[in-house]
């Protein structure tokens, strides 16, 4: 169903959507905002049941698909959509979605843990990479960024609608009966020396300080050129795809 929405940037509905940029308000209402066609397209294709409402300027293939899926679509002027969104260019569409339920995967083979990862761009990119590598779940522990932070959501490019993720305690993750690995530049063993065919939890830490002292196996990513190291998102991509290739033989 398509209807006409608010025409004033000062309307209560616009203000309520804009407040989703605030973490406390998001948690209170259990809602978050998806901005741009890619994220909204993935929500419509994979989790239409969590979409409360799509706001759109003009016509789009995404809004047509949403209407076919029974999702509420509301037409708004461009200035109203801009007032709702954090980004300067939301590309004419945004969606209010309910928080996603998390179901613990059965017999997981590849799990990603982000501990104290503060940068939303890194968190979103790693979640997207985990999705691409076929990981079973992503856990955010410690003081990691809120997964419903707007920049995290945008950085996932819709992958948060594909892969289960949740916030939990690190101890719960460490209790998993899987091989647990963490990267370290001073580790005694390199990535290629590890049996990655085993079901594995990859643990990635804070961008500046790494991980706390943990009783898990440390693995070094070999540097063949002159770079000092890889950034967090790049290191995660190397590790996750190494596991994905090994597990798929």
Predicted regions and their residues:
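Arg/Lys-rich RNA-binding interfaces used to dock onto structured RNA substrates
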Residues: 1-120, 143, 244
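Short active-site oxyanion
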Residues: 28-31, 50-53, 70-71, 136-138, ...
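Amphipathic alpha-helical repeat scaffolds
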Residues: 36, 118-125, 229-235
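Short, polar loop motifs at secondary-structure junctions
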Residues: 37, 57-62, 99, 170, ...
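Short loop/helix-cap segments at secondary-structure boundaries that form the rim of catalytic
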Residues: 62-69, 104-107, 174-175, 194, ...
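Structured adenosyl-cofactor binding patch, chiefly the S-adenosyl-L-methionine
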Residues: 95, 129-133, 144-161, 213-249
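RNA substrate-binding interface of SAM-dependent RNA methyltransferases
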Residues: 96-187
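Active-site/ligand-binding-proximal alpha/beta "capping" segment
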Residues: 182-228
